[in-house]
Amino acid sequence: NDFAKLFNIQSFASLQDFLSSEDIDAVYVATPHSDHFICALEAIKHHKHVLCEKPLTMNAHESMILLDLAQSLKVFLMEAYMYRAHPQTLNILNQLSIFNETNEKILIEGSFGFQAEVSSDHRLRNPLLGGGAILDVGCYPLSMCKLIAGHLQDLPFAEPKSITATGRLDKTGVDLQSDAHLVFSDQIEAKISCAIDEQLLNRLVISSGDISMTVSDPWHCGQFQEGKSSIAINHASGLVEEISYVDQIGLFTREIEHASNCILNQKIESDVISHADTQSNMFWLDQWRQQMQIVCPKNLIKNSPVLESKAFLNQTNKLENVNLPGLDKLASRLAFGCDNQTSEVHAFTMFDNFYGSGGRIFDTAYIYNNGMGDKYLGQWINSRQLEKEIIVIGKAAHTPQCEPQFIRPQILESLERLQIKKLDIFCLHRDNSEVPVAEFIDALTEIKEEGLIDLIGASNWEL
């Protein structure tokens, strides 16, 4: 209230009151990282356009949900990397042609680091608030080198082929400092650094042999030097060229104006940082942090806002459902494979979206993901209380255990992992020409009579 009175602006008692206001068209989310997802999600649900600070969310699973919902509701959503809307960045991209003729390797180097003397519960050091150097400032050189590597290859942005990282962790578990090496192609690589306990050069250098481009202030673009910024170019001929720029508008003003113009032109994404670019950035931030073996509490489903988002209730019904003889449940014409989800949060994100789209069949197997396919699906089914609404296809007796005696114990183990009473459909995962089909059928008939399965099928059988 004091802040509102000081600047003569309206204040609200809650997020819901704020988002329910008909006077608000768009919101800028600048909370600690851990609250980006919920604030942006609620804003999008209320059909408010969103400019959200980087990183968009705590992980790539949360960002998938936001981007998908924004596109579905035709709401503008932009991740706020302020340097993307500044003319200096456009100047950098326009000067990359100096590397067109080089046959040598191109190295992109970027750093962003500062020394913060803060307590362990400060957002920079608190894992519950999304602390750490990578999420706070490492995202800048990561996003920039992907942008540059992309334009060097005539792409909007580039996907690294690999990332390796080293660094130091805080006693709180967050990363204090990290260096990462990214390989984009046989010719293009990047080395990036970030820190929250060490002042770094905070610059961008692109080099290849005798050719180089140096940007002394790539992130703030002269915002704190009276708007003055410059790019130094060393040509192969030895000529040194400086491209200067004086900004009289302001870094963050430009970002706000860019977002506003996008909204006024009825765009749902920015042309300086697309939704695909944002999702790619989030994915590689995840990979970088995994390289550092950082354990983030919010990446556990019990702590994740994905659990509370209940995105499965957003029914778009894109998929047609039909009656399936032998079952008293509706079946979608498409089944979701539960074989490659990498975590609980990933599984909940994907399963929620599939169910919300009208998907009702989930296909798992005893061998999938070393049993985690069953476990993740079971956690989701029971958390969302959907056992009576969906159809579970289970499979067992895969080679080399494709024999009747393995079927029942593997079904029982799958049911234990799934924490459900029975499989709606059971399929033998492989065939075995050395075992008579009748022996498989006899075993399955007994299991069906026990009430452990309803329908019987086959998968990967030779006809």
Identify the meaning behind each predicted range.
Residues 49, 76, 107, 331-335, ...:
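Structural preference for beta-strand elements that scaffold enzyme active sites
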Residues 83-163:
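Predominantly a Rossmann-like dinucleotide-binding segment in NAD(P)-dependent oxidoreductases
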Residues 345, 352, 401-463:
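Glycine/proline-rich, positively charged
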Residues 1-46, 310-314:
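N-terminal glycine-/serine-/threonine-rich beta1-alpha1-beta2 phosphate-ribose binding loop
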Residues 26, 32-33, 37-84:
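Beta-strand-loop-alpha-helix segment that lines the small-molecule cofactor/substrate pocket
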Residues 170-175, 185-257, 267-276:
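NAD(P)-dinucleotide binding in Rossmann-like oxidoreductases
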Residues 302-390, 449:
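N-terminal binding-site loop/beta-alpha segment at the start of enzyme catalytic domains
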Residues 26-28, 185, 260-316:
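C-terminal helix-rich "cap/oligomerization" subdomain common to oxidoreductases
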